[in-house]
Amino acid sequence: MPQFQTWEEFSRAAEKLYLADPMKVRVVLKYRHVDGNLCIKVTDDLVCLVYRTDQAQDVKKIEKFHSQLMRLMVAKESRNVTMETE
């Protein structure tokens, strides 16, 4: 389970993993109040990518990344629905 040290590396790898097979990828966010750590995990059951942080500024990056993935998911779904109706 590779744990990334920089956000840029993690976000690129996670997006590639999602684009490879969108139906199998899951995203898990976990916050531990005791440690003050936020962990984001992206997995497709074969590859598991992990990024941990205790910095408040990284929360905004994670939020932006999460919304970017949601946009990709919606774009794929709307394309599939249009193709099915034709």
From Swiss-Prot:
One GO cellular component, as annotated: signal recognition particle, endoplasmic reticulum targeting
Cited PANTHER family: SIGNAL RECOGNITION PARTICLE 9 KDA PROTEIN
Domain of life: Eukaryota
Family, as annotated: Belongs to the SRP9 family.
Subunit-structure text: Heterodimer with SRP14; binds RNA as heterodimer. Component of a signal recognition particle complex that consists of a 7SL RNA molecule of 300 nucleotides and six protein subunits: SRP72, SRP68, SRP54, SRP19, SRP14 and SRP9.
Subcellular locations according to the entry: Cytoplasm
Keyword annotations: Cytoplasm, Ribonucleoprotein, RNA-binding, Signal recognition particle
GO biological process, one term: negative regulation of translational elongation
Record's signal peptide: none
Organism lineage string: Eukaryota, Metazoa, Chordata, Craniata, Vertebrata
Protein name: Signal recognition particle 9 kDa protein
Protein task: Component of the signal recognition particle (SRP) complex, a ribonucleoprotein complex that mediates the cotranslational targeting of secretory and membrane proteins to the endoplasmic reticulum (ER). SRP9 together with SRP14 and the Alu portion of the SRP RNA, constitutes the elongation arrest domain of SRP. The complex of SRP9 and SRP14 is required for SRP RNA binding.
Gene designation per UniProt: Srp9
The organism of origin for this protein: Mus musculus
A molecular-function term among this protein's GO annotations: 7S RNA binding
One Pfam family of this chain: SRP9-21
